[in-house]
Amino acid sequence: MSSMHALAPSAEYPITDRNRLKRRHDRGSYDRCSVHAILDAAMLCHVAYVIDGQPFCTPTLFWREGDMLYWHGSSASRMLRHLKAGTPACLTVSHLDGLVLARSAFNHSANYRSAMCFGTARIVDDPEEKAAAMRAVVDRFYPGRSDALRPLTGQEAKATTFIGMEIEQASAKVRAKGVADDEEDYALPIWAGVVPVRTVLGEVEPCPRLIDGVAPPPELGLYRAGRSLDEGLTEAQHAYEEG
Amino acid sequence: MSSMHALAPSAEYPITDRNRLKRRHDRGSYDRCSVHAILDAAMLCHVAYVIDGQPFCTPTLFWREGDMLYWHGSSASRMLRHLKAGTPACLTVSHLDGLVLARSAFNHSANYRSAMCFGTARIVDDPEEKAAAMRAVVDRFYPGRSDALRPLTGQEAKATTFIGMEIEQASAKVRAKGVADDEEDYALPIWAGVVPVRTVLGEVEPCPRLIDGVAPPPELGLYRAGRSLDEGLTEAQHAYEEG
């Protein structure tokens, strides 16, 4: 784990014009751990890409393996057809953690964690990498589950396209604090405070057509009712990485 | 409210190559009500824009007035400097509503609501429109609150830039149902079901420096503990529209 090890990735992503934070430097960082923690707490990301000068912002499920990001969709989708040759993309994850009501309009804010990742998105066409992605898209979220499923058919494999992108640059941005008013405003008789926001899991709704006696699988324990989705996804990522 | 009224906006956004759904047509629509409902339930969006061929995907707070979308940031921000001349943008909102575990990898899915809006983003430089935005950025989320705040200073107004974009095309996409397995897979002894996901508000954390006797304002009632953020934001939008 020493950063002196020749093969260890450096602690920070390289900083270029693409990912350099242009404002609120106090909220930002470039280190891998911060970026990965924000990514691993999410299932949904937004990917920006360009077709003929027109930007598109597409929401999609994604997952991370080291510095690789993967997402998937039908080979018919607009984005994927255009990505075949490899195209610059920006994948962003954001978590809204709180509403911040201040004593002035200017100091109203939100608590959040976000990560922006830059790279070149490419279709995964290597058969081994694609087979691994077919398992990962299930097992990253539900560790061990792919072994228990009905095996993939050849037709399903053909109809599935995965996109892979190595993170070339990235940045993380976090606001996680209370009201930050101008010093003289604290004396005003105006209410200020934070409303926390949390994304939580509800009671599982089993499929009404379950075969009698089929018990909930162990991976469902990660997503028990009342837990944060964040926590469940982060724990699932760790379990997935440990194999 | 009749669609025969000459001045009423048509029920659907025009369909062009930009917003035409390329897959899962069964989940999509182009009607204003569906798109607006998804937007109005959110505070956070992701905006895609392009600088020198490089796509950026930026998370930001936003709000809607009719078919106009607004978001804001420091005039120093990368996005805004490049948007001054007006630039194509795509603003997307997504809500994750559930994890869908099926009997095959292929039928794993998520419940979600998303809206993609296309248009030309421009700096709001008309003084009246900017003054209105200064109030709206507070009042859309906290109806009536801007009147109770310490007034904006000239320096704050100068340091604030708003972006406006009229929605030229848009689409909505929704998955809101249970497991959809292949018919023959329902006979398999594999667990399947849905884990609902909800974004909820926590107990308010008042600023520790509140002046004695300052009571929580009425607009905070929209964001009471245990309520969905969705619901609070949707109700706030209605209150804001009713003035």
What are these regions (language model features)?
Chain A
Residues 1-22, 66-76, 112-121, 240-242:
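N-terminal short leaders/motifs
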Residues 5-10, 75-136:
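Short, structured beta-strand-loop surface elements
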